[in-house]
A protein has these predicted regions:
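Glycine-rich, flexible N-terminal cofactor/catalytic loop recognition
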Residues: 1-64
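A contiguous loop/helix-start segment that scaffolds small-molecule binding in enzyme catalytic cores
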Residues: 2-3, 60, 84-85, 164-235
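Class I SAM-dependent methyltransferase SAM-binding "motif I" and its flanking Rossmann-like core
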Residues: 3, 103-161
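Short glycine-rich anion-binding loops that position phosphate/pyrophosphate groups of nucleotides
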Residues: 9-11, 91-95, 175-177, 203
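Short active-site oxyanion
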Residues: 27-33, 112-116, 168-169
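Alpha-helix capping/helix-boundary segments
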Residues: 39-41, 93, 123, 177
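Conserved helicase motor
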Residues: 62-69, 144-148
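Glycine/small-residue-rich loop that forms an oxyanion/phosphate-binding "nest" at active or ligand-binding sites
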Residues: 65, 70-115
Length: 235
């Protein structure tokens, strides 16, 4: 059995307001955990209670991240196929959305492993519904290109397609580059385009601002650097 376990979107005291009790029950019964890093996996486990003498330190953690090649994923899957209760967790939010877990789940499906997902916070879905830009048609673009010329070209292409297809585009950036990306969006998008910045979702510092670009150019901009943010546009 492979459990897809939701994680928090940031540091909060307690988790009952975000994660359902079914996640507590699933985690308390785990035999193994797959995580992006030992530190993040152990931090996740530490939030939950286990029946004594078992503690969060007793759960073995196996790494699955951008450095895990196909051979290593298959070797990990060989262990999952043998049985026990395995959990898969992302550093934050739902696994398999913009993280390496998606390819592993496909492998698990191909080999007949039973997979169960649990409800939890997703910055993609939360930003979409909070933005007000509509959820009928949308595309998650993921991370933007690192090279500025390519990035601006991609932004203009998304804006054009959004207007043509009447859909919303969602995308993200490495948090320390958020302010620079917001500046580029305001400079290069057309003034009638809708732009949303959804920041620190589910946290006490949550901020969601949706305005046309022409209004963004006039207001005081929020400080977004090092704060997890999802950007959305609708042409």
């Amino acid at each position: 059995m492979l459990y897809l376990l939701p994680n928090l979107l940031g540091d909060t005291e307690g988790h009952s307001h975000v994660l359902p009790s079914s996640v507590d029950r699933a985690v308390s019964g785990l035999d193994q955990l797959i995580a992006e890093s030992e530190k993040a996996g152990r931090k996740f486990l530490k939030r939950f209670a286990f029946d004594p003498p078992k503690t969060f330190r007793d759960i073995p953690i196996h790494l699955l991240n951008e450095h895990t090649d196909l051979k290593q994923r298959k070797e990990l899957l060989d262990q999952v196929v043998q049985g026990q209760k395995w959990g898969l967790v992302s550093d934050c939010g739902m696994p398999c959305l913009a993280d390496p877990g998606e390819e592993f789940v496909l492998l698990a499906r191909e080999h007949g492993v039973e997979v169960k997902a649990f409800v939890g916070p997703s910055s993609i879905l939360l930003s979409l519904v909070l933005s007000g830009l509509g959820g009928q048609r949308f595309t998650f673009r993921g991370y933007m290109p690192k090279e500025k010329t390519l990035r601006i070209k991609e932004l203009k292409a998304m804006e054009m397609l959004s207007r043509k297809e009447r859909c919303v585009y969602l995308f993200i950036e490495t948090p320390y580059r958020n302010d620079a990306l917001l500046q580029e969006l305001i400079e290069h998008l057309e003034e009638k385009t809708w732009l949303c910045a959804a920041t620190d979702l589910t946290l006490a510092t949550e901020s969601v601002i949706t305005k046309k670009v022409q209004t963004w150019r006039k207001i005081k901009r929020p400080f977004l650097d090092k704060r997890p943010t999802v950007f959305l546009l609708r042409g």
